[in-house]
Amino acid sequence: AALLHGDYYCERVASLVRRALERMASLAAKVPAHDEEAAAAIMETLVLTGIAMQLAKCTRPASGTEHIISHYWECKKLTHGVISDYHGKKVGVATLVVADIYHKLGKLPKPVAHPEHIDWEDVKQHYGPELTPDMMKFNEPNTIVDEIDPKLVTEKWDEIMKIIDEEIPSTERLRELFALAHAATTPEQIAVDRDLFRDGIRYHIFMRRRVTIMRVLPMVDIDPLNVYEGK
Protein backbone atom coordinates (compact mmCIF):
# COMPACT_ATOMS: atom_id res chain seq x y z
CA ALA A 1 0.00 0.00 0.00
CA ALA A 2 2.89 2.36 0.75
CA LEU A 3 4.62 1.54 -2.54
CA LEU A 4 1.53 1.68 -4.75
CA HIS A 5 -0.81 4.09 -3.01
CA GLY A 6 1.41 6.22 -0.78
CA ASP A 7 -0.16 4.91 2.44
CA TYR A 8 1.61 5.73 5.68
CA TYR A 9 4.39 3.37 6.74
CA CYS A 10 6.76 3.69 9.68
CA GLU A 11 9.65 1.27 10.12
CA ARG A 12 9.76 1.90 13.88
CA VAL A 13 6.13 0.84 14.21
CA ALA A 14 6.79 -2.21 12.03
CA SER A 15 9.79 -3.14 14.19
CA LEU A 16 7.64 -2.91 17.31
CA VAL A 17 5.20 -5.43 15.89
CA ARG A 18 7.99 -7.70 14.60
CA ARG A 19 9.59 -7.92 18.05
CA ALA A 20 6.26 -8.80 19.64
CA LEU A 21 5.60 -11.49 17.05
CA GLU A 22 9.06 -12.98 17.38
CA ARG A 23 8.66 -13.33 21.14
CA MET A 24 5.24 -14.89 20.75
CA ALA A 25 6.52 -17.34 18.15
CA SER A 26 9.36 -18.39 20.45
CA LEU A 27 6.81 -19.32 23.12
CA ALA A 28 4.25 -21.04 20.89
CA ALA A 29 4.90 -24.47 22.39
CA LYS A 30 4.05 -23.17 25.88
CA VAL A 31 0.61 -21.84 24.93
CA PRO A 32 -1.33 -25.14 25.28
CA ALA A 33 0.04 -25.59 28.82
CA HIS A 34 -1.34 -22.19 29.88
CA ASP A 35 2.21 -21.23 30.75
CA GLU A 36 2.46 -17.94 32.64
CA GLU A 37 5.25 -16.57 30.45
CA ALA A 38 3.31 -17.42 27.28
CA ALA A 39 0.15 -15.81 28.66
CA ALA A 40 2.12 -12.68 29.52
CA ALA A 41 3.60 -12.62 26.01
CA ILE A 42 0.14 -12.88 24.46
CA MET A 43 -1.10 -9.93 26.51
CA GLU A 44 2.05 -7.94 25.77
CA THR A 45 1.67 -8.63 22.05
CA LEU A 46 -1.96 -7.48 22.12
CA VAL A 47 -1.00 -4.30 23.95
CA LEU A 48 1.96 -3.56 21.68
CA THR A 49 -0.08 -4.05 18.51
CA GLY A 50 -2.74 -1.78 20.00
CA ILE A 51 -0.08 0.88 20.61
CA ALA A 52 1.23 0.33 17.08
CA MET A 53 -2.25 0.95 15.68
CA GLN A 54 -2.52 4.16 17.68
CA LEU A 55 0.87 5.33 16.41
CA ALA A 56 0.03 4.46 12.80
CA LYS A 57 -3.53 5.82 13.16
CA CYS A 58 -4.86 2.74 11.36
CA THR A 59 -5.37 -0.96 12.03
CA ARG A 60 -2.73 -2.17 9.58
CA PRO A 61 -0.13 -3.13 12.25
CA ALA A 62 -2.52 -5.83 13.49
CA SER A 63 -4.98 -6.38 10.67
CA GLY A 64 -4.41 -7.32 7.05
CA THR A 65 -6.01 -9.40 4.33
CA GLU A 66 -6.44 -12.33 6.72
CA HIS A 67 -8.79 -10.27 8.90
CA ILE A 68 -10.89 -9.17 5.95
CA ILE A 69 -11.31 -12.77 4.81
CA SER A 70 -12.42 -13.69 8.31
CA HIS A 71 -14.92 -10.82 8.32
CA TYR A 72 -16.35 -12.05 5.02
CA TRP A 73 -16.89 -15.53 6.44
CA GLU A 74 -18.47 -14.08 9.59
CA CYS A 75 -20.80 -11.68 7.80
CA LYS A 76 -22.00 -14.33 5.37
CA LYS A 77 -22.73 -16.72 8.23
CA LEU A 78 -24.63 -14.00 10.08
CA THR A 79 -26.93 -13.51 7.08
CA HIS A 80 -27.96 -17.13 7.65
CA GLY A 81 -28.41 -16.61 11.37
CA VAL A 82 -25.25 -18.50 12.29
CA ILE A 83 -22.85 -17.20 14.93
CA SER A 84 -19.24 -17.86 13.96
CA ASP A 85 -16.40 -19.33 15.94
CA TYR A 86 -13.87 -16.94 17.48
CA HIS A 87 -12.62 -14.27 15.07
CA GLY A 88 -9.00 -15.02 15.95
CA LYS A 89 -9.31 -18.70 15.06
CA LYS A 90 -10.59 -17.79 11.59
CA VAL A 91 -7.88 -15.15 11.19
CA GLY A 92 -5.32 -17.84 11.91
CA VAL A 93 -6.68 -20.15 9.22
CA ALA A 94 -6.87 -17.23 6.78
CA THR A 95 -3.26 -16.32 7.61
CA LEU A 96 -2.13 -19.72 6.33
CA VAL A 97 -4.15 -19.22 3.14
CA VAL A 98 -2.82 -15.72 2.48
CA ALA A 99 0.81 -16.69 3.17
CA ASP A 100 0.47 -19.62 0.77
CA ILE A 101 -0.95 -17.43 -1.99
CA TYR A 102 1.57 -14.63 -1.52
CA HIS A 103 4.58 -16.94 -1.71
CA LYS A 104 3.17 -18.66 -4.79
CA LEU A 105 2.80 -15.28 -6.51
CA GLY A 106 6.56 -14.91 -6.48
CA LYS A 107 6.88 -18.08 -8.57
CA LEU A 108 4.59 -16.80 -11.33
CA PRO A 109 5.80 -14.84 -14.37
CA LYS A 110 5.95 -11.11 -13.74
CA PRO A 111 2.57 -9.69 -14.82
CA VAL A 112 1.70 -6.49 -16.65
CA ALA A 113 -0.97 -4.49 -14.83
CA HIS A 114 -3.96 -2.69 -16.31
CA PRO A 115 -7.10 -0.99 -14.92
CA GLU A 116 -9.27 -3.63 -13.29
CA HIS A 117 -12.50 -4.83 -14.87
CA ILE A 118 -14.87 -6.18 -12.23
CA ASP A 119 -18.09 -8.05 -12.88
CA TRP A 120 -20.08 -6.21 -10.24
CA GLU A 121 -23.22 -8.26 -10.79
CA ASP A 122 -21.24 -11.36 -9.89
CA VAL A 123 -19.81 -9.64 -6.81
CA LYS A 124 -23.25 -8.47 -5.66
CA GLN A 125 -24.67 -11.94 -6.18
CA HIS A 126 -22.06 -13.41 -3.84
CA TYR A 127 -22.53 -10.71 -1.21
CA GLY A 128 -26.30 -11.02 -1.33
CA PRO A 129 -28.97 -8.37 -0.69
CA GLU A 130 -28.12 -8.00 2.99
CA LEU A 131 -24.43 -7.16 2.53
CA THR A 132 -24.31 -5.54 -0.92
CA PRO A 133 -25.41 -1.99 0.09
CA ASP A 134 -22.66 -1.64 2.71
CA MET A 135 -20.10 -3.35 0.48
CA MET A 136 -20.78 -0.92 -2.37
CA LYS A 137 -20.19 2.06 -0.06
CA PHE A 138 -16.51 1.06 -0.10
CA ASN A 139 -16.44 0.86 -3.90
CA GLU A 140 -18.41 3.88 -5.12
CA PRO A 141 -18.08 6.26 -6.85
CA ASN A 142 -14.69 4.66 -7.51
CA THR A 143 -12.67 1.80 -6.06
CA ILE A 144 -9.45 2.13 -4.11
CA VAL A 145 -7.40 0.66 -6.96
CA ASP A 146 -8.77 3.26 -9.36
CA GLU A 147 -6.32 5.50 -7.51
CA ILE A 148 -3.35 3.30 -8.45
CA ASP A 149 -1.38 3.71 -11.67
CA PRO A 150 -1.17 0.26 -13.33
CA LYS A 151 2.33 1.07 -14.56
CA LEU A 152 3.42 1.43 -10.93
CA VAL A 153 2.10 -2.04 -10.11
CA THR A 154 4.18 -3.53 -12.91
CA GLU A 155 7.21 -1.47 -11.93
CA LYS A 156 7.04 -2.37 -8.22
CA TRP A 157 6.00 -6.01 -8.60
CA ASP A 158 9.47 -7.50 -8.09
CA GLU A 159 10.05 -5.30 -5.04
CA ILE A 160 6.74 -6.42 -3.55
CA MET A 161 7.63 -10.07 -4.12
CA LYS A 162 10.99 -9.49 -2.41
CA ILE A 163 9.24 -8.01 0.63
CA ILE A 164 6.95 -11.05 0.80
CA ASP A 165 9.93 -13.38 0.70
CA GLU A 166 11.73 -11.46 3.46
CA GLU A 167 8.84 -10.62 5.77
CA ILE A 168 6.26 -13.41 5.58
CA PRO A 169 7.17 -16.81 7.04
CA SER A 170 6.63 -19.82 4.82
CA THR A 171 3.36 -21.70 5.13
CA GLU A 172 5.33 -24.67 6.45
CA ARG A 173 6.86 -22.57 9.25
CA LEU A 174 3.49 -21.09 10.14
CA ARG A 175 1.93 -24.55 10.30
CA GLU A 176 4.71 -25.67 12.64
CA LEU A 177 4.01 -22.75 14.97
CA PHE A 178 0.26 -23.30 14.82
CA ALA A 179 0.74 -26.97 15.65
CA LEU A 180 2.90 -26.09 18.66
CA ALA A 181 0.19 -23.72 19.91
CA HIS A 182 -2.62 -26.18 19.11
CA ALA A 183 -4.21 -23.54 16.87
CA ALA A 184 -6.81 -24.19 14.16
CA THR A 185 -5.37 -24.69 10.68
CA THR A 186 -8.25 -25.93 8.51
CA PRO A 187 -11.66 -24.59 7.43
CA GLU A 188 -13.31 -27.61 9.05
CA GLN A 189 -11.93 -26.58 12.44
CA ILE A 190 -13.66 -23.19 12.18
CA ALA A 191 -16.91 -24.53 10.67
CA VAL A 192 -16.42 -22.83 7.29
CA ASP A 193 -17.66 -25.00 4.43
CA ARG A 194 -15.92 -25.35 1.08
CA ASP A 195 -18.05 -22.83 -0.83
CA LEU A 196 -17.81 -20.15 1.86
CA PHE A 197 -14.08 -20.78 2.21
CA ARG A 198 -13.48 -20.34 -1.51
CA ASP A 199 -15.78 -17.31 -1.81
CA GLY A 200 -13.93 -15.62 1.04
CA ILE A 201 -10.63 -15.90 -0.79
CA ARG A 202 -12.09 -14.49 -3.99
CA TYR A 203 -14.59 -11.86 -2.85
CA HIS A 204 -13.34 -10.45 0.46
CA ILE A 205 -11.38 -7.71 -1.30
CA PHE A 206 -14.47 -5.60 -1.82
CA MET A 207 -15.41 -5.52 1.87
CA ARG A 208 -12.91 -2.79 2.78
CA ARG A 209 -11.48 0.22 0.99
CA ARG A 210 -7.93 -0.87 1.55
CA VAL A 211 -4.95 -1.56 -0.70
CA THR A 212 -3.61 -5.07 -0.20
CA ILE A 213 -1.79 -7.40 -2.55
CA MET A 214 -5.01 -9.39 -2.93
CA ARG A 215 -6.91 -6.22 -3.84
CA VAL A 216 -4.42 -5.50 -6.63
CA LEU A 217 -4.63 -8.97 -8.21
CA PRO A 218 -7.59 -8.14 -10.52
CA MET A 219 -5.29 -5.54 -12.11
CA VAL A 220 -2.93 -8.32 -13.18
CA ASP A 221 -5.55 -10.96 -14.09
CA ILE A 222 -4.56 -13.27 -11.24
CA ASP A 223 -7.30 -15.20 -9.45
CA PRO A 224 -6.09 -15.87 -5.89
CA LEU A 225 -8.29 -18.95 -5.59
CA ASN A 226 -6.65 -20.50 -8.65
CA VAL A 227 -3.24 -19.68 -7.19
CA TYR A 228 -4.16 -21.29 -3.87
CA GLU A 229 -5.56 -24.40 -5.52
CA GLY A 230 -2.62 -24.67 -7.90
CA LYS A 231 -4.61 -24.19 -11.09
Predicted features along the sequence, with ranges:
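Flexible, glycine/charged-enriched surface loops at secondary-structure junctions
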Residues: A33-I42, T59-S63, H80-K89, K107-H114, ...
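Short alpha-helical scaffolding segments that buttress acidic/His motifs in well-ordered protein cores
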Residues: A39-M53, T95, F178, G200-I205
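Catalytic cores of large soluble enzymes that bind and process phosphate-bearing ligands
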Residues: H5, Y9-L16, H34, K57, ...
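Acidic catalytic cores of enzymes that act on phosphate-bearing nucleotides/polynucleotides
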Residues: V47-K104
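Carboxylate- and glycine-rich phosphate/diphosphate-binding segment that chelates Mg2+/Mn2+
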Residues: A1-S63
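Short runs of predominantly hydrophobic/aromatic residues within well-ordered alpha helices
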Residues: V17, A39-T45, E66-I69, G88-G92, ...
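C-terminal charged capping/lid subdomain of soluble metabolic enzymes
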Residues: L105-K231
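Short acidic (Asp/Glu) and glycine-rich catalytic loops that position anionic groups and cofactors
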Residues: A1-L4, L21-S26, L46-A52, S70-L78, ...
